[in-house]
Amino acid sequence: MTDDFGRVDFGAFLAPWHRADSDANFAIHQDLELVEHLDRLGFAEFWLGEHHSGGVEIVASPEMFMAAAAQRTQRIKLGLGVVSLPYHHPFLVADRLVLLDHLSRGRMIFGAGPGQLADDAKMLGIDPIDSRRKMEEAFDVIHRLLAGETVTQKTDWFTCQDAYLHVAPYSNIQKAVTATVSPTGPKLAGKYGSGILSLAATNPVGVEKLAEHWKIAEDIAAENGQTVDRADWRLSGIMHVAETEEQARADVRHGLLYLMNYLSNITPGFAAAPDVDSLIDGINDAGLAVIGTPEMAVTQIRRLQEKSGGFGKFLVLHGEWASTTAALHSFELIAQQVAPHFNGDLGPRLRGYNQTMNSNRSAADITQAAQEEAQKRFEAERAIRTN
C-alpha cells in the first residue's frame, strides 16, 4: 500500500561492480541480461555508471551500454548514472544525449556527476578539487542546449561558440544530479528543476543529510522560479534478499567482501572488513545495506521514508555480491514481496481479500442460494413442458 509518503517505484543502480578476477566480456553481457530481466519483472528504471580505472567498474561509456540495452528492452527507463561531466566537452555530451533519446524513444534519463574515482581524474589531468565546479559549468551548458538555446561560453577548460543542437531531442529529457554528502547536487537540482540521485542515502552520514538536501533543493528552486518533485528523487542502497536471512548471507559470500573492501579504498569513511560475517553484521546494523529477507527490505524503505520525508524511486545498488542465479532471484523477491508495499498494488487487493474473509461466508451463501433458485426454475420449466 502507499501512505502519506506517496508511491515508490523500484529500479537498479549498477556502477557496475564486478570482481577483477572475472572475465570482462562475460560481466558486460551479464549486465545486459540483467536489464532485460528487470524489464520483464516490471522494474521502473535501470542505471549504470561511467568509470575508467580500478578494474572493477568496467563500463567506460554508459551511453553506449544503454544504446545496446534500448534494443533489448521495451519499457524500462535507462538512466546514465552518471556521466562524469568534467571528463567531457558539454556540447558533445548534449549531442550524444539527443541520439540516445532517439534510440530509446524517450526512455533515457540523464544523470550528471563530477566523477568519483581519483585515478580517473589523474589519468585525464583533472584536479578533483575542481570537479564540482566543472560539473556545474557543464550542466548549465547542457541544460541550455537541450532547451534549444544557442550557447556561446568560454571557460578554462571548454569553449562553445554559437553552439546549438541541429537535431532536437525526441522527448523532454529527464535530468538528475548526484548527491552524496555535499550540497552541490541538491543546489543544482533546485536551480534547474531537476531530479536528485542520492547515492549515499543509506550511508550513516548520508541518511542524516536527506531532509537537509531536499530543503536545499526546494529553497534554491523557489529562488530560481523552478519546482522540484519528490517523485523525481531517487535514493539508492545495497539490497540482496532471499527467503531467509541465512540464505541471503550465504548468497553474498560469492563476492561481497571482495567488492566492499575495494570500495573501502575509494570511499571516505568506509573501513575494510576482516571477514564476510562481520561485514554483513556491520552494514546491516548500520542500515547501510539489507542482506536478509523481503521483510527487512520493507523496513529499510520505511526508515528512509521517515528520514527523507518521502521520495519517488528506490534504486537497488547492485554489484556482483552473489551468483547470477541468486541475484536474479533477489530481484524477483523484491518485485513480488517488497515493491507492492509501496507502489499502491497491495492496499486494494488486501481490502478485497479481507472483506471476503470477514464476510462469514455470506458471498458463498448468496451464491449457493442463487444456484438453488436456478435449479428450482429449471425443474419448474421442465415440469410445465412434460405436462
Swiss-Prot record:
Q: Which reaction does it catalyse?
A: (4S)-limonene + NADPH + O2 + H(+) = limonene 1,2-epoxide + NADP(+) + H2O; (4S)-limonene + NADH + O2 + H(+) = limonene 1,2-epoxide + NAD(+) + H2O; (4R)-limonene + NADH + O2 + H(+) = limonene 1,2-epoxide + NAD(+) + H2O; (4R)-limonene + NADPH + O2 + H(+) = limonene 1,2-epoxide + NADP(+) + H2O
Its domain of life? Answer: Bacteria
What EC number(s) are associated with this protein in UniProt?
1.14.13.107
Q: Which cofactor does it need?
A: FAD
Q: Does the keyword Acetylation apply?
A: no
Q: Which one of the record's GO molecular function terms can you name?
A: limonene 1,2-monooxygenase activity
Pathway listed for it?
Answer: Terpene metabolism; (4R)-limonene degradation; (1S,4R)-1-hydroxylimonen-2-one from (4R)-limonene: step 1/3
A single GO cellular-component term on record = cytosol
What is the enzyme's class at the highest EC level? Answer: oxidoreductase
Instruction: Give the signal peptide, or none.
Output: none
Q: Check the record and name the Pfam families matching this protein.
A: Bac_luciferase (PF00296)
Q: Matching SUPFAM superfamilies, A to Z? A: Bacterial luciferase-like (SSF51679)
Q: Record keywords: NAD included?
A: yes
Going by the UniProt record, its keywords in alphabetical order are: FAD, Flavoprotein, Monooxygenase, NAD, NADP, Oxidoreductase
Q: What family does this belong to?
A: Belongs to the bacterial luciferase oxidoreductase family.
Its job: Acts on both enantiomers of limonene by their NAD-dependent epoxidation at the 1,2 double bond forming limonene-1,2-epoxide.
This protein is called Limonene 1,2-monooxygenase
